[in-house]
């Protein structure tokens, strides 16, 4: 009788580092997502997001890179604090954590700025550098607007690191009151939604790029009943 194959080290790592749990709130890092229907599904726990082992490592690598960026900022004489400061949104059902608050920035030595760090692949890095974060990564831009508005800050220091080359890109993002108010209204609309049909699909084609890789695809396009 042949024995069952034993799990390898990689098998065990992949099993133990795969996690899945819903967010307890509507995240500030998602509020500028292009699909409002997705945000309703996410807030209402209509699906169980699953973070595979590889993606989990990518997230943890991002945390490690953020620490490296912060150390470099401090070497440049910039004061960093307030890491993971929480901000709260509509009736406590929305919110998020900032990467920090910085002061003594050479470009704005007398001001206090929001700090947000992101690591990305080479193509995304070049796109952000060429177009600016507002156009290239509107979700990041919206995240910073929410945090600046909640913390009463006029500017954000956005730092991106190219994971292929380790190059840095720094951009200063100014507070946009119109965008902030729009996102605050969006928070309320998502949280107070009574029926998913209040929000049309971003596309009726499940193979469209944003839908194809969406965690809520089965619930949204196939009509599968949520687990709970």
Residue ranges and their predicted role:
Residues 73-81:
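Short secondary-structure junctions
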Residues 44-46, 118-123, 161-165:
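Short connector loops/turns at beta-strand edges and beta->alpha or beta->beta junctions
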Residues 134-137, 141, 146-228:
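Metal-dependent nuclease catalytic regions and adjoining charged, substrate-binding loops involved
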Residues 55, 129-135:
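Short glycine-enriched, charge-decorated loop/helix-capping segments at active-site entrances
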Residues 2-3, 53, 96, 224-228:
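Cys/His-rich finger/ribbon microdomains and the adjacent scaffold used
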Residues 84-91:
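Short, solvent-exposed loop/turn elements at beta->coil junctions and helix N-caps
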Residues 1-68, 76, 207-210:
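Charged, glycine-rich intrinsically disordered N-terminal tails and low-complexity linkers that flank
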Residues 35, 69, 73, 96-131, ...:
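Conserved catalytic cores of phosphodiester-cleaving nucleases, focusing on short active-site segments
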């Amino acid at each position: 009788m042949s024995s069952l194959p034993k799990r390898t080290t990689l098998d065990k790592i992949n099993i133990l580092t795969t996690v899945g749990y819903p967010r307890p709130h509507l995240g500030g890092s998602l509020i500028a997502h292009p699909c409002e229907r997705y945000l309703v599904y996410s807030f209402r726990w209509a699906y169980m997001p699953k973070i595979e082992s590889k993606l989990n490592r990518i997230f943890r690598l991002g945390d490690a890179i953020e620490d490296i960026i912060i150390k470099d900022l401090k070497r440049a004489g910039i004061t960093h604090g307030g890491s993971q400061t929480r901000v709260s949104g509509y009736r406590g059902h929305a919110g998020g954590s900032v990467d920090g608050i910085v002061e003594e920035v050479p470009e704005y030595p007398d001001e206090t700025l929001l700090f947000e760090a992101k690591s990305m692949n080479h193509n995304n890095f070049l796109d952000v550098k060429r177009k600016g974060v507002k156009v290239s990564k509107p979700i990041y831009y919206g995240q910073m607007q929410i945090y600046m508005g909640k913390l009463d800050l006029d500017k954000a220091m956005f730092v991106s690191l190219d994971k292929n080359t380790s190059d840095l890109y720094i951009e200063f993002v100014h507070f946009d009151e119109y965008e902030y108010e729009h996102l605050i209204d969006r928070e309320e609309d998502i949280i107070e939604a009574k029926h998913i049909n209040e929000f049309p699909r971003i596309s009726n084609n499940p193979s469209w790029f944003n839908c194809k890789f969406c965690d809520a695809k089965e619930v949204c396009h196939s009509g599968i009943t949520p687990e709970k």
